[in-house]
Amino acid sequence: MMQGEVSPSPSLIDRTIRMRKETESRKVVLAWGLLNVSMAGMIYTEMTGKLISTYYNVTYWPLWYIELALASLFSLNALFDFWRYFKYTVAPTSLVVSPGQQTLLGLKPAVVQTTPPRDLAATQISPSPPSPSIQGQSVLSYSPSRSPSTSPKFATSCMTGYSPQLQGLSSGGLGSYSPAVTYSPVSGYSKLASFSLSPSSPYPTTVGPVESSGLRARYRSPPTAYNSPTDKEDYMTDLRTLDTFLRSEEEKQHRVKLGSPDSTSPSTSPTFWNYSRSVGDYAQTLKKFQYQLACRSQAPCANKDEADLISKQAAEEVWARVTMNRQLLDHMDSWTAKFRNWISETILVPLVQEIESVSTQMRRMGCPELQIGEASVTSLKQAALVKAPLIPTLNAIVQYLDLTPNQEYLFERIKELSQGGCMSSFRWNRGGDFKGRRWDTDLPTDSAIIMHVFCTYLDSRLPPHPKYPDGKTFTSQHFVQTPNKPDVTNENVFCVYQSAINPPHYELIYQRHVYSLPKGRNNMFHTLLMFLYIIKTKESGMLGRVNLGLSGVNILWIFGE
């Protein structure tokens, strides 16, 4: 700020904001004033002509007093608005700023008075006798005897101009403080200000290194105004320079916190390693520190980004054997999200609703012991045979539950996976906690559950096959689980092969080739996506005699056009 007071009130920023508000309000108050005058005139016309009384044949005598009150109110509002407009127009808030501040504040030349920095500095800086505690020492060098109240600050003219290179300093003689002081972030902060020579100044022209403690408090006033009541804070006029300045000072503060005794010496300044010096120049400094081996990080050697990159490259190599279009991998995340959504909305949500409906029917029929999630799979299969006419969907539901003896966990986990729309609780290599007990390998993983319900759903969509009387046409033809192994030598084998149980890993077998996508949380989804993509591109969208497109299962929409 370019004011001469110690604590200006209001500040330059506040006055600038107020001036902008006045400029914006000038047009608004004028409009309101004209509106109030118009309303008052209309009411006065009605009072004199009695238009309402004549037109509506109203003789209510308080009406005139109501109109008088409204006319008076609008008139007073109009007078107040015109007074504000006159005040903002005739006597607006004016500012005295430097050209740099005018540019930063975005002020128009018509509303400010621009004063050259030299004149402003000349009106603020007055010579004063030097303090004995700083006589004969560097202006910005550290002195243990210096009291906190005498810490030097930048003058208002210190920051009026910046240069990309350090201004030269005179090495001899005495100098007087110049209002054209320049600051350079390239100097490494070992030199900060330039002084013009004059025999009247008691201060040396050399400037020592900047201390790293109390950094921001030490760069605020000229050397001739440590305790002067006219010294004033200033703002840097360039954001890039300010950022560079603060970053370098924070680096120096960090060196001080490390406990280095030479942190304030020129050798440990930010430019210490920028000079062309030999190793011998650092011998005295380096021998003070003991060489220690760094602790080995507990994190894995390859971070997540590197693992993802390797996984993506491996996936590209596998997909390149299926299609030459390498841009497909750019859509893989979108395909995976759509596929998860399809499984949730098409299989899991309807399955949970049907299970709850069947359980309700069982209770109404007086069979509470056959509640799904409590009864065993064997009991449910027998009930499906006996009560098939009453509950025809029970047999289809039992096929989805024929995965693990722990029916309660399976049902609860399917309910959890059906929530959220996109299986947000899915965990590829484990499952959910059950009755306060953490998941263990005696329970199926989420990948196993999703693969089972997916295969069972397609079993229900494919027509019956005489070779598979149990109705598991898709599962028997297109899914193989270890310890069983597919016949890779058979060209007609087209299946998903689960080669590992914990953690689960899936591979695709197609035309005597094994396509093994990268392991991890998306292995199952990506393998199934490749399975469906081959059906779409190489099998014309047909899985046997069933169309997986719009006219059939309607799952190939996830690939778009």
Swiss-Prot record:
Annotated stretches, region: Disordered: 120-156, 196-233, 250-270
Calcium in keyword set: no
Phosphoserine: residues bearing it: 9, 11, 98, 201, 248, 278
Ranges of compositional bias, category Low complexity: 138-152, 260-270
One Pfam family, short name: CytochromB561_N
Residues listed as glycosylation sites in the UniProt record: 57, 274
Membrane topology: Multi-pass membrane protein
Function: Nuclear envelope protein which in association with NUP205, may be involved in nuclear transport of various nuclear proteins in addition to MYC.
Oligomeric form and interacting partners: Interacts with NUP205.
Stated name of the protein: Transmembrane protein 209
